[in-house]
Amino acid sequence: MNTGESLSLTVTRTIRADAARLFQAWTDPAQLVAWWGPRPVTCTEAQVDLRVGGRYRTGNRLPDGNILYISGVFEAIEAPRLLIYTWQVEPAVGRPERVTVRFDERDGQTEVSITHERIGDAALRDRHQAGWQGCFDSLAAYLEG
């Protein structure tokens, strides 16, 4: 039962790439299409207006062939260390969720930490948790080859 309180999650992964390369992979539409999504989900399109107040949108092909669109607005950008943006599945209903992505480079590799907040219920939180882990797998495969 949802008592009106929102849930959050944090997932972290160290990837063998510098922070600038990771930030670019996360914000360049051509690169997003190449890696975004937990397999077998694939990204069919990506639009990114990388500025505070700018919008992003991804089209995500699900295993059943349907396209799920996720969009939001950038709230903070500190290249190549931080992105904060809202997150809503279209059509957008209710208060958007919020995603914070931190890139902490050390010794030629980068710890990427995602905090996903304002999640409506535990089942959705668990799906997001699995989705972000899958996105990390796809991102690591894309960058580490």
Predicted regions and their residues:
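Hydrophobic ligand-binding cavity/cleft-lining segments
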Residues: 1-42
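A conserved amphipathic terminal alpha-helix motif
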Residues: 117-145
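Short, hydrophobic/aromatic-enriched beta-strand segments in well-ordered soluble domains
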Residues: 13, 114-116
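Generic alpha-helical structural signal
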Residues: 16, 71, 133-137
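Hydrophobic-ligand binding "helix-grip"
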Residues: 33, 46-52, 57-107, 117
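Tryptophan-centric aromatic hotspots in well-structured domains and transmembrane helices
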Residues: 23-26, 87, 129-132, 136
